[in-house]
Amino acid sequence: MIKVFGLLHKRSDISQTKFHSHWKGPHAVHAIKLVPVMRRYVQNHKATTAYPGMEPPCDGSPEVWLQSLEGGGTLNTMPDYINGAFIDEPNFMRVRSSGIAVSENIIIEGPPIGKKDKLTKVLYFLKRNPALTSEQFREQWLAHEGALLVGQNNLRRFVRSPTLPETYVDGDAPYDGVEEVWWNNKADFDKDKKSGGAHKAELRLLLDTKATTAMFVDENRVVWPGLSDDKD
């Protein structure tokens, strides 16, 4: 399954509250019309709690599941997109936004997540050490057993998604991969943050630690197929 992470920045003349309200409300209505090309769609809203010691990459990150990259091209030419979400974007966000296409690798499945479940989630947008090629980074990262920046004794779900090679065709990608980590609550995150992930020496070899970013996010699961609105 292919996923696309967008990197949205609010318009400079509107508040964070208005940005998140418009994206979650009127804009989400447009997105629902893009099924079935868009298999799932989650809005990752930057939470008010800042991630300790790291900058956020954006104000929000739409997460879209597609059957293929070609599906993404189809989505961008659909009349429902052109006459709906596309026209609405300047109402709340800075255009045009950037993003990356990734392949989803579920490391720890965890219990099913219902559409309305409230969890603690962090998105880690990873930038490789400039000494590594994208292929070298991908190989070394995928060989690492756990999450890079936190322990995993208390986490609920862990997904590791490397940026697709096709993303590099026109030059370097904004990020080389994403780690998504969920916990049942903030206290469980605090425990895993304290225990740490990879050794600092390993992180320096693998990552550009200054360009790697992270943020707590509040998930709005807009398109989340399942048996009901409350089941995965």
How would you name each of these model-derived features?
Residues M1-D232:
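Macromolecular interaction modules
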